[in-house]
Amino acid sequence: MYSQRFGIVQREVKGPTPKVVIVRAKPPKGQGAEHHLQRIQHSHQKHHAILASIKSIERDRLKTEWDQHNDCKFVDSLVKARVKDAMQGFIINTEERRNKLRELLASEENEYFTEMQLKEETIEEKKDRMRDKIRLLREKKEKERQDFVAEKLDQQFRERCQELRAELFCIHQKAVCEERKAQIAFNEELKRQKVVEEQMFSKLWEEDRLAKERREAKEERRQKELVENTRLGLNAQVTSIQAQRQAAQRLKEEEALLVENENAQVKLENEQDKLKKQKTKQEIRAALQKALQEKMERMQQEYREEQDLNMKLMQNALQSLQEETDKKKQKKEDMRREQKIYYQYLAQRHEEEKAQEKELDRMLEKEKEKKFAEKDKELRLEKEARKQLLNEVMCTRKLQVQEKLQRKAKEQEERTMEQERINEGLKELNCEERENFIRRCSLAQEYRKQLQMQICSQQQAREAEEEEERREFEAGIAAEKSFQDKIQGILSTHQVVPRNIHPMRRACSTKLPP
């Protein structure tokens, strides 16, 4: 147990002197059987506790199910009782309403019989009344039928009358034209407003640009003044340093005169002092230069910080897209470079536009030449086709003329032969005509009488037809007049109901004409 908790532990421990060993005591032996028995008892206790918990849960579940079953039975019985009461009440109310209705019908029937007895209406009067009622119903139905027929005829007239449809189409087209004019005016107004807004924005942009240029000029003047003041201060410092140097130089010259009058040892000492002084002066000069450089750097740093602060303030105030650099000179160079690039871009753009225009002109010329070539080709083909057609027509005409000449020659021969046969026949008929002359004269007189009778009958029929045509013409004029009156009446009472309203009219109903 001990070894399991602390690992393997050496029992022998070396002492303070050689061959001196200390032995650790053995740990007490664990009572394994008791621990095992305790574990078994603990597991049995846990098992019995789990069984008891399961039994308790099962008992609670059965109890809950029993309670739910009882609640469901109670609710079902309660619902059935309430439904039964409601049905009985409904049946009772229905019976009461039926009884009341029976009593009301009986009372109305009694009143009707009483009224009939008071009126003492006879069968003839009743028949007359029924006939009048039937006549009125027939007249009403006939009127409804006539109205329906008139409505359908009017509808058929509206659908089939081309003149009415043309008039309605003209009215609709006129309304559409008016709406289109109003829409065009509305679009022109929108364009004008857009132009005004663009002019206003360009004016504001120009004012903003001028204000920015004024601020930049003011800032540039302020920077120049600051640089000038700094330069003057630095010049004053340099002048003071030069004065100090001149004073030191004069002191050095005086010391040199004193050193020349001394002996060699003093001269050596003076030389050493001189070297020390020169070193000191160099250190002073280096310190002064370093201080001057640090001051210049500090002023430049302050200037840069001030420039950065001004840049941040300008960016926050104007929301500008350009970032200014720490020095105005660099900014001017950038502006010049950008302007130069912009001019180069404009020149390049101009050259590209010129090249595009030249290319477009070349393409147009090429297209024009191509079209002219195609047109010349079409004209040439058309001319050749016309010439070929003319040749074919001339050939056909020539053949027709030849055929006609041949046919005429043949007909002339046939006529000559026919004339000869006719002459022979005439000679034969002359004798027959002399014999039949008297008979033909009598037949001619009879035929003349029949012709006169036919002419009279035809003249009478013609007069009757003319009279009939006149009556039909007058009826047609009357029908045309009624037709035009009907069209005008429909047009005067016609009211166009737009089924498909234009989106512009729907969106701007107050601005467009009705």
Curated annotation (Swiss-Prot):
Coiled-coil region list: 207-429
Question: What domain of life is recorded for the organism?
Answer: Eukaryota
Which cellular component terms (GO) are annotated to the entry? axonemal A tubule inner sheath; axonemal microtubule; centriolar satellite; ciliary transition zone; manchette; sperm flagellum; spindle pole
Q: State the compartments where it is located.
A: Cytoplasm, Cytoskeleton, Cilium axoneme; Cytoplasm, Cytoskeleton, Flagellum axoneme; Cytoplasm, Cytoskeleton, Microtubule organizing center, Centrosome, Centriolar satellite; Cytoplasm, Cytoskeleton, Spindle pole
Q: Which residues cross the membrane?
A: none
Q: What does this protein do?
A: Microtubule inner protein (MIP) part of the dynein-decorated doublet microtubules (DMTs) in cilia axoneme, which is required for motile cilia beating. Regulates motility patterns of both 9+0 and 9+2 motile cilia through differential localization and recruitment of axonemal dynein components. Required for centriolar satellite integrity and non-motile cilium assembly. Required for motile cilium formation. Through its role in beating of primary cilia, involved in the establishment of organ laterality during embryogenesis.
The species is Bos taurus
Q: Which gene encodes it?
A: CFAP53
Q: Which protein are we looking at?
A: Cilia- and flagella-associated protein 53
| Complexes and interactors | Microtubule inner protein component of sperm flagellar doublet microtubules. Interacts with PIERCE1 and PIERCE2; the interactions link outer dynein arms docking complex (ODA-DC) to the internal microtubule inner proteins (MIP) in cilium axoneme. Interacts with CCDC38. Interacts with CCDC42 and IFT88. Interacts with centriolar satellite proteins PIBF1/CEP90 and PCM1. Interacts with dyneins DNAIC1, DNAIC2 AND DNAH11 and with ODA-DC component ODAD4/TTC25.
Kindly state which keywords UniProt assigns to this record, in alphabetical order: Cell projection, Cilium, Cilium biogenesis/degradation, Coiled coil, Cytoplasm, Cytoskeleton, Developmental protein, Differentiation, Flagellum, Spermatogenesis
Q: Which GO terms describe its biological process?
A: cilium assembly; cilium movement; determination of left/right symmetry; flagellated sperm motility; manchette assembly; sperm flagellum assembly
Q: In which tissues is it expressed?
A: Expressed in trachea multiciliated cells.
- Name the family: Belongs to the CFAP53 family.
